[in-house]
C-alpha cells in the first residue's frame, strides 16, 4: 500500500488488489459485503495512523476510485468547526455511514452496468485482445472523446451522421465516465477525420486520456459499431 500525505488534513493511498488479498480481504468483499468493506476501511485507517500519525478526530470525508489493478482512496478531515466538536462516537458513526453509503453507491453502479451490458459485453474476448488490437492499429489515426453519462452516448448514437464507415470504435468506462475511441483507416482523409471529430464534440468533450491509459484502467463495454449497438439496446431519450 502506498500512502501519500497531501497536507495536514488529507491523505491519499493506493492499494493493489493483490495487497488487499494479502490482508485477508477479497476484491468482492469491498463491493458486495458491506461489513467486510467497513472492516477493510478501518484497517486502512489504523495503518495510515501508524505511518502518518493521521488520527481520526471528528468526521472524515472519503473518496474512492476503483481501477483495474487496485483502489485509490482520498481521506480528508473536516474543517467545519461545528463538525469538529462532534463526540468520538458520533464521528465514528458518521464515518461508518459514509463508508456504507459509498459501498452502496459503488455496488449499485456496478449492478446497473451488469444489467445494461451483460448481454453484449464479451469481457474475456475484449480484454484479452485489446492490446493485440492496439498493436494492429499502428497505421490508423485515433480520436478519443469523453461522454459525461450514458444519456449523452445515446443521444450521439441517434443523432450522429457518420461521414465515413472506414473506422473501428470502442466504448470504455472508468470512474463513471464514458470514453469513445475511434480508429480511422490510414487512407481516410484528414478533413474527414476533422469533420467527424467536430460532430462528436456536439455531444461529447475533448479529453487528454490516451489509449494506453484506457487499456490499463478502463473497461471496454462495447466494441464494433458502437452506435448501432446503442440504438439496438437503448431507446432514444426525449427532453
Curated annotation (Swiss-Prot):
Q: Any coiled-coil ranges, and where?
A: none
Compositional bias (Basic and acidic residues): 118-128
The UniProt GO MF terms for this protein read: protein-macromolecule adaptor activity
Disordered: region residues: 118-137
A Pfam family per the record: MecA
Cleavable signal peptide: none
Superkingdom assignment: Bacteria
Q: InterPro entries, from UniProt?
A: MecA_C_sf, Neg-reg_MecA
Q: Which family does it belong to?
A: Belongs to the MecA family.
State the function annotated in the UniProt record: Enables the recognition and targeting of unfolded and aggregated proteins to the ClpC protease or to other proteins involved in proteolysis.
Q: How is this protein organized at the quaternary level?
A: Homodimer.
HAMAP family, per the entry:
MecA
Q: Read off the domain note.
A: The N-terminal domain probably binds unfolded/aggregated proteins; the C-terminal domain interacts with ClpC.
The entry's protein name is: Adapter protein MecA
The beginning of the lineage is: Bacteria, Bacillati, Bacillota, Bacilli, Bacillales
